[in-house]
A protein has these predicted regions:
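Predominantly soluble domains enriched in secretory-pathway, periplasmic, or organellar proteins
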Residues: 1-424
């Protein structure tokens, strides 16, 4: 069994048919003792623009007013609070919260009108100070993925910037992220146009386009940013020194991109819903980040790969199951399994175990790992059941199944405010 003597804590948000449920779990000791606290209020905020849930601080809920940008602490979270997803800047004490805009236009009409949606940057502060709203920045429309670029040992001249992709615009906003550069700090200094006119029916060369970027990471091995354009089935190789697209690599059929811990391999996940109207075919592919060759491809019947992340050492890859499609295809899906792969010798990818967990009859099932080298725990939510599976990362067995809600839900999120966990 894994050594779980170190302390751990989780903050979870589960959407139960429009009502948000917020719970905090903490535990320690070899007997995996844990405590659960429910922070959900029975009533809504009563506001036109519901507050944003940012995280927990000293046992209180951190809420951001989207109109005034004021941040306050509360004993409870209103049931209509918006659980904004976020990206932690690894080089500062700041978190970037994303707003995808409304479902139809992708615009944050409160802050940007019809000109895009937003990224909100918050300074966490210390134990004795309130978090501070730094800036709300209008970027492009639709879902965002943020990638932080900064100098590293292998590439010490890289600029300090953040790449924010915009799904519905087909672009990447380059945001200055160097506090010593006051002219460019937290300003959009460049916009990368991801349009490929050969992939557009009308010969479009501008923004918006049909690139639909989703999945983007910086490799410290190559010093390049790899951006997956779902609409085109391409991976763009971008030089962060110039913000220019150097190469476009075919990678069709994959919906997300993940880099190996060594930065030398690109792992794509996707699903084929067209070949067989009764069965979904899940796919995992490994591309060499320097030769751009697909060096491994795995296909799993009746499986939709939802979230995937490496453990702390990079020797295991955990892939969660979830639901997609409709009719017979959806009925045949395996939505109760966690797939665990040996990645200690990439590009080899060997299945260690398909582990039975609870159900996820929804499109996304995240995963979390304690940010502690002494802990080997893995946490996988089961949204449909309203439970959380605690997994021993050494033996890859379920230690416990924890009830976190009275009923099931359709969307689950971990909060990464506390830095106590990492994942997806």
């Amino acid at each position: 069994m894994a050594d779980i003597k170190s302390n751990w804590s989780l903050v979870n948000h589960l959407d139960c048919n429009g009502k948000g449920m917020l719970t905090a779990l903490s535990g320690s000791g070899s007997e995996h003792h844990f405590e659960i606290t429910n922070f959900t209020a029975s009533e809504t905020s009563g506001k036109t623009h519901a507050p944003w849930f940012l995280g927990l601080k000293n046992g209180q809920v951190i809420l951001l007013d989207p109109e005034t940008k004021e941040i306050n602490l509360s004993d409870k979270m209103p049931s209509d609070a918006f659980p904004a997803y976020s990206y932690k800047d690894p080089n500062s004490n700041r978190i970037w919260f994303m707003n995808d805009g409304d479902k139809d236009s992708g615009n944050d009409t409160l802050n940007c009108g019809d000109k895009g949606s937003t990224v909100t940057i918050v300074e966490k502060g210390d134990e004795n100070t309130l978090p501070k709203h730094i800036k709300t920045l209008c970027v492009g429309r639709g879902h965002h993925v943020t990638t932080f670029v900064a100098p590293c040992d292998t590439h010490p001249k890289l600029p300090k910037v953040a790449y924010v992709s915009n799904l519905l615009d087909g672009s990447i906003c380059v945001v200055g992220n160097d506090p010593s550069d006051s002219d460019n700090y937290l300003h959009i200094i460049h916009t990368i146009n991801l349009c490929d006119s050969e992939k557009e029916n009308d010969g479009n060369t501008g923004i918006p386009n049909n690139a639909f970027p989703h999945g983007k990471q910086l490799s410290q091995a190559t010093g390049k940013v790899y951006s997956l354009n779902n609409g085109y089935g391409l991976v763009d190789v971008i030089d962060p020194m110039t913000h220019e697209i150097e190469k476009r690599i075919p990678f069709k059929g994959f919906s997300n991109l993940l880099l190996s811990k060594c930065g030398k391999f690109i792992i794509g996940k996707g699903a084929d819903r067209k070949s067989d109207h009764e069965h979904v075919l899940g796919r995992l592919a490994i591309m060499d980040a320097t030769t751009y060759e697909i060096v491994n491809l795995m296909e799993i019947a009746d499986f939709y790969p939802s979230a995937y992340r490496f453990n702390q050492t990079g020797e295991k890859l955990y892939v969660t199951s979830a639901a997609t499609g409709k009719g017979v295809q959806k009925d045949n899906l395996n939505i109760n399994t966690l797939f665990i792969y040996d990645t200690s010798n990439l590009p080899e990818l060997n299945l260690i175990k398909s582990l039975a967990v609870g159900a996820s009859d929804c499109g996304r099932r995240p995963i979390a790992f304690p940010n502690d080298e002494n802990s080997k725990l893995v946490f996988v939510p089961n949204p449909t059941d309203g439970t959380l599976s605690m997994i021993d990362g050494d033996s890859d067995t379920v230690i416990d199944t924890i009830k976190i809600a009275d009923s099931g839900g359709n969307e689950f999120n971990f909060s990464f405010w506390q830095n106590s966990i990492y994942g997806a």
